[in-house]
Each structure stands twice: as C-alpha cells, then as structure tokens.
C-alpha cells in the first residue's frame, strides 16, 4: 500500500457528496467546488448524506487512487460548514 508523504494535506469536502461519483466526477468537484488542484498529491475526502461512506481521492504520481470506506453500524461525524471544522479542530 502506498502512503502519502508528511507534506500531504487533507481537504474535506463540506456537506454531502453523491457517492455515485467516481474518479472523474470527484476530481471535477475538487477543481470547481473546492478550487483546488486534484493532481497536487493531497488527499480529498468526501462523505455521503447518510454519513456512512467516505471516499478519498489521491493523485499518486502516475494516476488517481480512490479509497472507500463504508460503515455498517456507525456514522462518521462530518462538518457541514467551515465554522464546524474550526470548532472541531480546536477541541
């Protein structure tokens, strides 16, 4: 398994993301909604409305990686706004 470097940043896509999107759709969201470069090597994390699925998009030198995690019984705590991110990061 390839792991990102220590300089890699993690960006959360706030709110809900349609989990039917795959690499192409998520990379467009990174460019248009987040105004970031999907080829930067940083991690871009997306969550669905039910908060039980995460997808992580990552550019790995010669292609995209798309990691997915689905919880069967529990839910991810996911921010809806940047204010929630600020509040959670100070705890």
Predicted regions and their residues:
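Polybasic/polar functional segments that serve as interface/processing modules
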Residues: 1-91
């Amino acid at each position: 398994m390839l792991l990102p470097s220590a300089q890699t940043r993690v960006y959360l896509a706030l709110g809900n993301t349609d989990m039917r999107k795959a690499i192409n759709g998520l990379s467009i969201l990174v460019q248009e909604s987040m105004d970031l470069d999907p080829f930067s090597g940083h991690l871009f994390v997306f969550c669905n409305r039910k908060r039980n699925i995460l997808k992580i998009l990552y550019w790995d030198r010669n292609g995209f990686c798309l990691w997915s995690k689905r919880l069967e019984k529990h839910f991810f705590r996911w921010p809806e706004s940047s204010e929630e991110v600020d509040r959670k990061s100070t705890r």
